[in-house]
Amino acid sequence: MRWNTVLFDLDGTVTDPKEGITCAVAYALRQQGIIADPDTLTSFIGPPLHESFPELFGLTEEQTDRAVEDFRVYFSRQGWAENIPYKGMAELLESLQGAGLKLVIATSKPEEFALRIMEHFGLAAYFHRICGAQREDLSLIHI
């Protein structure tokens, strides 16, 4: 059987999200007077923010809600642009597309940010669809 579609995640597959996520977390924590060791902030990559802030820094529910909001403020301003495409990704995508495959992004990142990131790095044109979380879903996932 020949496959005709290749499904990609965004963070950790197409782009390295470390800089944008860790800087956004550091910003959110600073808003609450917490200065964190940068090495601990990589633990925020992957799990939902609403779990990571209380687990790693002991934030209350109210503090966590505020930290998540501050994270989103930073991320929407500049954190999204701090993603870095992995070396060779454009060439890989071009090759797959040239082989007649449909390429799709499926991410828990809000779709507006996924689109912005892919367009910023000139990668959006390789994809048939870029699918992410919708705005109303944001309380359930991390960015």
Task: Describe the predicted segments one by one.
Residues 2-90, 99, 112:
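N-terminal helical cap/lid subdomain that shapes the substrate entry/recognition surface
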Residues 13, 110, 136-138:
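Glycine-/small-residue-rich active-site loops that bind phosphorylated ligands and cofactors
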Residues 25, 89-118, 131-133:
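Substrate-recognition element of Asp-dependent hydrolases with the DxDx(T/V) motif
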Residues 29, 118, 122:
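Conserved hydrophobic residues forming the short capping helix/wall of the S-adenosyl-L-methionine
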Residues 35, 123-128:
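Conserved H-loop
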Residues 71, 131-137:
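Short, acidic/turn-prone active-site loops that include or flank metal/cofactor-
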Residues 141-143:
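Conserved small/polar residues in nucleotide/adenosyl-binding loops
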